[in-house]
Amino acid sequence: MSIQTKFILFLSSSLFLTPYSVATEKSPQPHDGRLDEQLHLAKPNLPQKTPALLTNNNPSKLSITKEELAKHPDLIIRGLIPAVLQNNGEAVQLLLPLYQPLPKKDPFLLEWAEAIDLREKGYFSDSVKAYRHLFSQKTDLLPLRYQLAQALFLNNDNEAAKDQFQKLRAEQVSSDSVKIIEQYLSALNQRDQWKIQGGFSFLNESNINNAPKAGTKIGNWTAWEKESARGFSYFGNAEKKWSLPHNHFTKLSLEGSGKYYWDNKKYNEFNARAGVGLGYQTARFELSLMPFTEKRWYAGGSSGGNAMKQYSKNSGARLDLSNWLNEKWQISTALEYGEQRYETRKHLNGNNYLASATLLYLAKSGQYWFGGADYNRENTRDLDNAYQRKNVRLGWGQEWKAGISTRLILNYARRAYKEKDLIGIRQKNKEYASVLTIWHRNFHIWGITPKLSWSYQKVTSNHPFYEYDKNRIYVEISKTF
């Protein structure tokens, strides 16, 4: 009897005699957007399965080395067939290198094992291609349909994965298999749900208007005096994706943020931004293009009043790209262009450019590092307000013993203005900033973990009016729904 005949007979008998088992999802924690979100991915909590290879119902166990196994092709084939049927990635990766050199190989069995191997290595797109080729040859194999659906799920081809899981659920499969299929379908539905996040922090500003040292003068010009303010900042974000065929999606993003000071209301502000666009995603890669419009309301600052008024609007487009290079390294980039218009300060009308890149390293489950660089250019009608800003960032997040977590972010930037101002100085600044945040993972208030942050800012400049430093301590509270 040929290898292919044995394989087909085994497939047929296994489908009728035993329910097929399914493997636990294995994917990089992909992470698209903010860092806390990149580290979390909606996925089903699937049961662990016992590898079928080298186990049986007898108390005695078969023990054989890889070298000895290579001398027995029949044992390799007898082990590989149930391994692919049972979606046993570990067994397939053990046996596939031993099966590939054999002179007589079944092409279908070989390609199936290679598809599983690609999935286990994280090459989900290539794995999907292999599974689709296999499935085009044998559409009646339920284990193959399941594994295709799983690979599509891992590759973020949501619509195709949902279609395959729904078809699989309609088959006569075991109740345990139905439960696992429904876990996948539930996870797919969650991917298209609204993601809502909001939070606020208390503010106690001792130098809200970034004033230099008291008494700073340039000729007959005297710098403004410090002002203090107490209040809170707040933000809210809502985002929804709609999955489209072939890994594409549409996306809606709504963002709002502001500051409210009860004892110095002329510094109150509110910003709102809305964007809608298209994107493409796999398990490791995401690309999106989002046209947006943004409005700002502001009370006016030192020369303003207590009521906020429409201050400016900005419309443009943003291109985001995120790619996991492997399980530990991720690179994210963003390009943005906007046209900015002011209600009264027409001399600030112009356009703005942003280019940003961040490299993330997940050292282990409780530690991450990141570094980034940003370039920002503001073009305004009056050239003394136009500038270029170049920034570098470093960050470190750590989970410590006793439930303590910390996050440290350091920034350094250079800002250079295009022309001299009224005093005759072409401003060049060096900007330093740091934020240290600490919280206890087991301390919650209504399901929310408060975080204590200390921030420090310092600006040195060739323009004495724009040199200052300040620090503040604040409590940060946020929640994702």
From Swiss-Prot:
Which InterPro entries does this UniProt record tie to the protein? Slam_C_b-barrel
- Its source organism is Haemophilus influenzae (strain ATCC 51907 / DSM 11121 / KW20 / Rd)
Subcellular location(s) of the protein:
Cell outer membrane
Q: What residues form the membrane-spanning segments? A: 194-204, 233-243, 248-258, 271-281, 285-295, 315-325, 329-338, 353-363, 368-377, 390-400, 405-414, 432-441, 448-458, 471-481
**Hey, which family's this protein in?**
Belongs to the Slam family.
How is this protein annotated for GO cellular component?
Answer: cell outer membrane
UniProt KW Transmembrane keyword: yes
Question: What membrane topology does the annotation report for this chain?
Answer: Multi-pass membrane protein
What this protein is called in its record is Surface lipoprotein assembly modifier 1
Ranges for region C-terminal probable beta barrel: 193-481
Record's function text: Required for correct export to the cell surface of some cell outer membrane lipoproteins.
Instruction: Relay the domain remarks.
Output: Consists of a soluble N-terminal domain and C-terminal probable beta-barrel in the outer membrane with 14 predicted beta-strands.
Q: What is the predominant subcellular site recorded for this chain?
A: membrane
Keyword annotations: Cell outer membrane, Membrane, Signal, Transmembrane, Transmembrane beta strand
Establish whether keyword Transmembrane is in the entry. Answer: yes
Signal peptide residue numbers: 1-23
Region (N-terminal domain) location? 25-192
